[in-house]
Regions:
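Conserved GNAT-fold acetyl-CoA-binding loop/helix
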Residues: 33-54
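A short helix-loop-beta-strand connector motif used in the catalytic cores of GNAT acetyltransferases and
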Residues: 54-67
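Acidic, low-complexity intrinsically disordered regions
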Residues: 25, 32, 36, 58-60
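Acyl-donor (CoA/ACP) binding surface of acyl/acetyltransferases
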Residues: 1-32, 65-176
């Protein structure tokens, strides 16, 4: 099935999520590292997820979302989304594709899409203070710390307080 491609480079593209992606996306949301990184566990069965929790613009949770596709083989290697409300860009790279710079490439594509196509003035991104890899990726993509946006959450597994760091990037093409 052909899918809409939102934006890409020589290695990856961000493309629309299709029904065939539901299984791998659902599995990703149930992966321990993803739950730990988002501090959230999906409360839906697979059927409920397939019916209502799609990472696309038809969702009340996401204002935009896409799968991350590797162009050499069209493999879906992750997901990226912009949350509804506060424009917060989120990403998950599936476990077998981590530590290969795909996250940075895809996040940069997501930032470009948000600024060039969605025409946003600024975007937020966040990670927990113990997530060094995500923090480095966010900073490599040009985001700056925004301590006013930091939030403390109870850890999903331990119940302890956990600080989520906020970062922001402004559209360089928008008037200040």
């Amino acid at each position: 099935m052909d899918r809409k491609k939102y934006i890409g480079n020589d290695t990856l593209c961000l493309a629309e999520s299709i029904e065939a992606d539901n299984e791998i996306l659902y599995e990703s949301w149930n992966e321990h590292e993803t739950i730990w990184g988002y501090n959230w566990q999906i409360p839906y069965s697979f059927d409920e997820y397939s019916a209502k929790f799609k990472n696309d613009s038809n969702s009340d949770i996401w204002s935009w979302g896409a799968v991350i596709m590797r162009l050499e083989d069209n493999a879906v290697i992750g997901r990226i989304g912009l949350s509804a409300g506060l424009p917060d860009l989120t990403i998950t790279i599936f476990k077998t594709h981590r530590n290969q710079q795909y996250g940075t490439m895809a996040f940069l594509l997501g930032v470009r899409y948000c600024f060039e196509v969605l025409r946003l003035d600024k975007i937020h991104a966040g990670c927990f203070e113990d997530n060094t890899a995500s923090r480095k990726m966010i900073e490599r993509c040009g985001f700056k710390r925004n301590p006013e946006g930091d939030e403390t959450e109870n850890h999903i597994f331990t119940g302890e307080d956990r600080l989520q760091l906020d970062f922001v990037i402004e559209n360089p093409c928008r008037p200040k």
